[in-house]
């Protein structure tokens, strides 16, 4: 079955086999289909400041453990790594950002279209 749209909200930063997931998602889209991805700006100083001053404080007050220990293992992909992966498997990747600019944002949103079917198939065949 093929889909018009596949949407991912705050998941790609957690996926260890991200290229495989993106390639497979691209193959599940109809020709004019769209993959929509929203992610935190993991790897940026602004994102780190955001979670350390909110969730990090709350987590420490509740459990007396540094949240940074968890974050090292929770977010395995940075925003730039995710964007690079999307651009490899899709011809058209448009980004918008929650913040002043790409670098000064907390959250990123990507709309990906025109999957590069040949790259997806090649990656999935050689990844076995």
Protein language model features and the residues they cover:
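Short conserved loop adjoining the S-adenosyl-L-methionine
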Residues: 1-2
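S-adenosyl-L-methionine-dependent methyltransferase catalytic module, highlighting the catalytic core
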Residues: 5, 16-30, 34-124
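Active-site T/S-Asp motif of two-component receiver
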Residues: 8
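Hydrophobic adenine-recognition pocket in adenosine-nucleotide-binding enzymes
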Residues: 11-14
């Amino acid at each position: 079955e093929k889909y018009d749209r596949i949407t991912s909200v705050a998941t790609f930063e957690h996926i260890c086999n991200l290229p495989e997931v993106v390639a497979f998602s691209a193959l599940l889209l109809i020709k004019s289909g769209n993959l929509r991805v929203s992610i935190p700006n993991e790897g940026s100083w602004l994102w780190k400041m955001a979670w350390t001053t909110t969730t990090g404080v709350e987590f420490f007050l509740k459990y007396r453990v540094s949240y940074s220990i968890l974050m090292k293992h929770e977010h395995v992909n940075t925003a730039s790594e995710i964007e690079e992966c999307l651009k490899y498997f899709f011809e058209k990747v448009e980004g918008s950002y929650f913040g002043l600019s790409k670098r000064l944002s907390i959250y990123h949103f990507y709309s990906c279209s025109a999957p590069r079917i040949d790259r997806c198939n090649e990656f999935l065949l050689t990844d076995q």
